[in-house]
Amino acid sequence: ASGNDDKIAWYINDGSGSFSTQQIISTNADNAYAVYAIDIDDDGDNDVLSASANDNKIAWYINDGNSNFSSEQVISTTADGATSVYAIDLDGDGDNDVLSASYDDHKIAWYINNGSGSFSSQQIISTTANGAWSVYAIDLDGDGDNDILSASGFDHKIAWYINDGNGNFSAEQIIGTNAYGAKCVYAIDLDGDGDNDVLSASINDHKIAWYINNGDGNFSAEQIISTTAYTATSVYAIDLDGDGDNDVLSAS
């Protein structure tokens, strides 16, 4: 996703880590901000999602199975200043629903997938994520459904929203308010105890931090990993050194 040219694109991997030139999917995502790929229409291939800030749009692009993509299929144009998009099953019906974070209206929202890629109107989860930058979903309380995480920059907040298993969400549960200019949130098991801990990147304090999950969705104070990720914008974790634990990556 690239903002200055409004572009959603992909790059073909030949299987050995060599990539093609840019393959354009769309140039109609006005100030494209985020992209994600997952099967949306339950046909076994991975479709593409985008969030674009200037047109307040969440959209998807249908993969025909041979990596040919349709024109944009608009899910919503009411995510004002859309900054983040993610998809996962939220209501327990086996298909992937869509989540958005939008900066201008401080909103975390989701869109119910009927299983074939048709979506409901916007379902608001919260309008108190002030300057919402990032949204993610994973099981945080060990009950088998996917809860929601948000990072919001105006209030420096990392928060989560409890899923009851049917796509009904609690009010925000604050994890921390010390991520100054919170820009990105992610979750994965970091301490090897089987539950998903939370990571944040914050732009104003150049910080990468994590929050220890006790297993039922109660979190520690922030544990600082670094304050030298200058203007930190993104965080992710995966095993990089083959020792079986998840290491942390940052972009600044």
Please report, for each region that a protein language model flagged, where it lies by residue.
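Low-complexity/repetitive intrinsically disordered segments
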Residues: 1-16, 230-232, 236-252
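Blade-edge motifs of beta-propeller repeat domains
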Residues: 12-30, 62-80, 112-130, 162-180, ...
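Beta-propeller blade termini
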Residues: 33-42, 83-90, 133-140, 183-190, ...
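A short loop-to-beta-strand structural motif that recurs across blades of beta-propeller domains
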Residues: 7-11, 57-61, 107-111, 157-161, ...
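Acidic/hydrophobic-patterned starts of short beta strands in beta-sheet-rich repeat architectures
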Residues: 1-2, 42-51, 92-101, 142-151, ...
